[in-house]
A protein has these predicted regions:
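A charged, aromatic-enriched C-terminal amphipathic alpha-helix characteristic of glycosyltransferases
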Residues: 328-333, 346-375
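A short helix/loop element that forms part of the nucleotide-sugar donor recognition site in Leloir-type
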Residues: 46-48, 133, 183-195, 352
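Nucleotide-activated donor-binding/catalytic signature segment of Leloir-type glycosyltransferases, i.e.
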Residues: 242-267
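Acidic donor-binding loop of glycosyltransferase active sites
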Residues: 253, 269-287, 302
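Conserved donor-binding/catalytic core segment of Leloir-type glycosyltransferases
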Residues: 8-9, 195-221
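Donor nucleotide-sugar binding/catalytic pocket of nucleotide-sugar-dependent glycosyltransferases
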Residues: 38, 123, 139-185, 194, ...
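Membrane-proximal helix-turn-helix segments that form the acceptor-binding/catalytic region
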Residues: 77-81, 101, 105-109, 116, ...
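Nucleotide-sugar donor phosphate/pyrophosphate-binding loop at the beta->alpha transition
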Residues: 71-74, 110-113, 122-144, 210-211
Length: 379
């Protein structure tokens, strides 16, 4: 059934956003043809990426700060005009708050169906911590944009309940789970520079923001003298990891890799022994998150060590997929708790068959009804 074309908006460079890729695949399977719109990080980057549907990336003169977000809004407004005129779009899908206003504007102006997917609790994100004026502006922006929608998606029940209580919207939950697929063939450790006969802990994430646990993982190596740590991704903590490792004298056991395409990431994940998810509860967006890396580890068949947070910690305990590290506040205490959790996991961790059974219950296809149901007429 051909439903027409739908503009899908995102503020990143398209290449590494797995949730958006999966959303577009679901829309495509249901008869929609997505037209994916993102941005180019650098002027020399290609305007398109390799996908089985139309896509283009807009160039913005600013990369961060208020001027970036202002230029993004008008860049997306112009892009939606192109989606309507050149591609014949009749619906729009906004991903996160920074793309919602252009989508609401288009849906009201042209009578398009609209969908909104909040990938995080945007106004409680790390980047707004200690910035009350900037946070107040985003809250005002959110209230204004939310007038144009009556329902939305988000990533877990705690964030969904917060939006329901605040705005009275219908909020459906679609967690950041992988698509159902055959188990990935582990990447040869020799190719990655990992040791063959040592325990390798992995922390992966497209962007490692402050307090996402990368530096805590590095510090834990001081308590795990025979273990290695691999970091895959980008971001401030990713960049600082080697400096911390050198101060502790553990740099020989740290392996840092840039972010990589999803299929390559799956193979690297399958080559590790333990997956780490170590967010600190510094902001509500972290405190109530259910990171997609937990599900990536699960589908790769490796157990996890997770920080003691309300949503992620409960999931790990209830599903029996790893060990929750004891809560602590000081850097040294956190690292020690991680080390103790890793040792506990290696002594008495979940069996591979159990991980496979849990993974079978948590996959993207199980949420297709909620995803397609997010499209609605504008208010």
């Amino acid at each position: 059934m051909d439903r027409g074309r739908i503009a899908v908006l995102v503020s990143n460079d398209l290449a590494f956003d797995q949730r958006v890729r999966k959303t577009c695949s679901t829309l495509l399977d249901a008869g929609w043809e997505p037209v994916l719109v993102g941005r180019r990080w650098r002027w020399k980057d290609e305007k398109n990426i390799d996908r089985p549907y139309p896509n283009f990336r807009i160039w913005l003169p600013f990369k961060t700060g208020p001027l970036f977000y202002l230029s993004l809004q008008w860049g997306l407004v112009r892009a939606l005009g192109r989606c309507r005129g050149e591609y014949g779009c009749s619906a729009v899908w906004a991903n996160d708050l920074d793309t919602l206003w252009p989508a609401v504007r288009a849906s009201r102006r042209w009578g398009w169906h609209i969908a909104y997917d909040s990938h995080e609790w945007f106004t409680e994100a790390e980047g707004l911590k200690g910035k009350p004026i900037r946070k107040a502006l985003w809250l005002w922006w959110e209230r204004r944009a939310f007038r144009g929608i009556s329902r939305m998606l988000t990533v877990n029940g705690s964030i969904a309940e917060a939006y329901r209580s605040k705005y009275g919207k219908q909020v459906d939950v679609v967690p950041n789970v992988p698509e159902r697929a055959e188990a990935a063939l582990p990447m040869p450790r020799s190719f990655l520079g990992w040791p063959e006969n040592a325990t390798v802990m992995l922390m992966q994430g497209a962007f490692m923001d402050r307090d996402r646990g990368a530096l805590d993982a590095v510090r834990s190596l001081a308590h795990l003298p025979h273990h290695h740590l691999a970091l895959i991704g980008s971001g401030p903590e990713h960049d600082e990891a080697f400096a911390v490792a050198r101060r502790l004298g553990v740099e020989q056991r740290l392996h840092v890799h840039d972010r990589m395409p999803f299929e390559q990431l799956r193979r690297c994940t399958a080559a590790a022994d333990i997956g780490l998810s170590l967010d600190r509860p510094t902001v509500d967006n972290f405190r109530f998150s259910l990171p997609n890396k937990l599900f990536d580890y699960l589908h790769a068949g490796i157990p996890v060590v997770c920080s003691d947070l309300p949503v992620a910690g409960r999931f790990v305990r209830e599903e029996g997929i790893g060990v929750v590290a004891a809560a602590a506040e000081e850097n040294g205490d956190i690292a020690q708790c991680i080390g103790e959790a890793v040792r506990s996991l290696l002594q008495d961790g979940p069996e591979p068959d159990h991980l496979a059974k849990v993974a079978e219950r948590h996959h993207w296809g199980a949420h297709s009804t909620a995803i397609l149901g997010a499209l609605h007429v504008p208010r």
